[in-house]
């Protein structure tokens, strides 16, 4: 979670976002409906091995940060539905299953939105390096939840009803059209299910220099990915929220923040009806 503060500040300073603090609404009961209540209680109390199931040593500060992220998820969803586009400066959702967290994901805030908006069709466009196995688990629990995951590492995901997997077994650096085609197919799925809200997992870990990445995107290709996504979604007037998802390059300020700022810049550009042409046009 170390990157969240630097990205939020940079997005605001560059004029790409207006920061809104979560309302402080109580999401505890919602999380106990979403996940096994025993797991939620273990994480909130910090007692027992389940408290560290996401993959880090439990601390009160981590707990409070995770809860703020979930509050932000619902705030961003509400804002996107009302205003067209919003972001939650957050990560750590798509590997969390009903029973427990894992791989640094504590609670599945993607599925949380589907739970809290049962009357809306929620589509997760997951463009992280890793497949959204936790979200796939919740698709079996929520009929209004759909997913397309474009990944280099599948994490056990497989094609099933309302969950499509586009796996890139080798780097796409020299074969960008393969990724573009997967995006276009995903857009078709979004239209076919008449999505009321799209949650875009705009991972930075597909980048060619990411220590956990295998997809091999260049900075320019990641920019093009974000541009294509927002121009389609906002052009179709589909309410859209995005989250940062993965990204693990160091140092954060020099390597990671610029990649995430591209996502904010492309969202703002599409919202205003403009078209950025190159990452160098992104204000840092």
PLM segments and residue spans:
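Conserved beta-strand segments of alpha/beta enzyme cores
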Residues: 18-19, 144-146, 239
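Conserved alpha-helical scaffold segments that buttress catalytic/binding sites
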Residues: 74, 78, 87-235, 250, ...
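Well-ordered, non-membrane alpha-helical segments in soluble/globular domains
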Residues: 1-7, 220-226, 257
């Amino acid at each position: 979670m170390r990157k969240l503060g630097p990205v939020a500040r940079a997005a605001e300073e560059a004029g790409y976002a207006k920061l809104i603090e979560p309302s402080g609404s109580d999401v505890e009961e919602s999380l106990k409906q979403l996940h096994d209540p025993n797991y939620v209680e273990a994480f909130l109390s910090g007692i027992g091995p389940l408290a560290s199931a996401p993959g880090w040593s439990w601390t009160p500060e981590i707990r409070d940060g995770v809860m703020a992220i979930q509050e932000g998820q619902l705030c961003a969803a509400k804002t996107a539905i009302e205003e067209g586009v919003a972001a939650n400066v957050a990560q750590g959702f798509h590997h969390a299953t009903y029973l427990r967290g894992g791989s640094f994901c504590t609670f599945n805030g993607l599925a949380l939105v589907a739970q809290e908006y049962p009357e809306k069709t929620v589509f997760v466009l997951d463009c992280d390096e890793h497949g959204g196995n936790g979200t796939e688990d919740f698709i079996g629990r929520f009929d209004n939840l759909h997913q397309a995951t474009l990944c280099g590492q599948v994490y056990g995901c497989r094609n099933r009803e309302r969950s499509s997997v586009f796996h890139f077994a080798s780097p796409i650096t020299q074969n960008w059209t393969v990724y573009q085609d997967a995006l276009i197919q995903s857009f078709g799925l979004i239209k076919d299910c008449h999505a009321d809200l799209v949650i875009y997992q705009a991972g930075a870990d597909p980048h060619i220099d990411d220590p956990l990445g295998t997809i091999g995107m260049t900075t320019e290709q990641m920019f093009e990915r974000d541009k294509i996504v927002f121009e389609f979604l906002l052009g179709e007037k589909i309410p859209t929220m995005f989250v940062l998802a993965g990204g693990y390059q160091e140092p954060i300020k020099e390597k990671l923040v610029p990649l995430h700022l591209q996502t904010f810049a492309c969202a703002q550009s599409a919202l205003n009806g403009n078209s950025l042409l190159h990452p160098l046009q992104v204000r840092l």
